[in-house]
């Protein structure tokens, strides 16, 4: 396991009206912060021999270096990221300790899940070629910070996991942070009350166009047409908690199964700020 450091320039933000009112507390804004990565790549065998099945783990985990004990913004962001991406029990740990602990727990659960079944197969004389593929697990986590809308820091995490079943699973988590305070920005922080209905309608229109293109079917022109393709059969259109306040637009993420079958993959719909600014709280001057 190793660490690598990269420098990300975070432009100093000139805000006439503090973003979402949360930046008016006198704390120093994140500026030219050092982003550190913890890199882990490890193959752990089910038993103490190289012929037994393996759990392959790859983690590329980004966090903010805390320069001193008073760096409350970086600490707050790291705390939220660890709690959201790794789990609440890792929130108070140092990043390196959190990753080490997460790996150890994952490996232990892997062995607890399949070790006895594997031993039984070996005892019964099952050959290596006949062993079920699901004795081999795979887990990867890739994360990154990037600059978003003025005053906002974006964080994305992509998780891939295979632990048996018909196919692997992959999902993403998107987070937004106020650079002035380290506060995570939720939908309620960013969009006005009552904006859910009109924005859902806008996203539905985007989805219809997106699916018509993706499926190469110009006949997809309505909600009913989407439902005929297996989309939005179990839920109404909604504004997801998974969103990014990017530089020129807000992007909304629907993971597999959120609104469509697995085969449709991850769906991302974007709305330019020019179209949704009337629904946003406390706009900044750009």
Predicted regions and their residues:
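Compositionally biased intrinsically disordered regions enriched in Thr/Gly
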Residues: 24-286
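Bacterial Sec-dependent N-terminal signal peptides
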Residues: 1-34
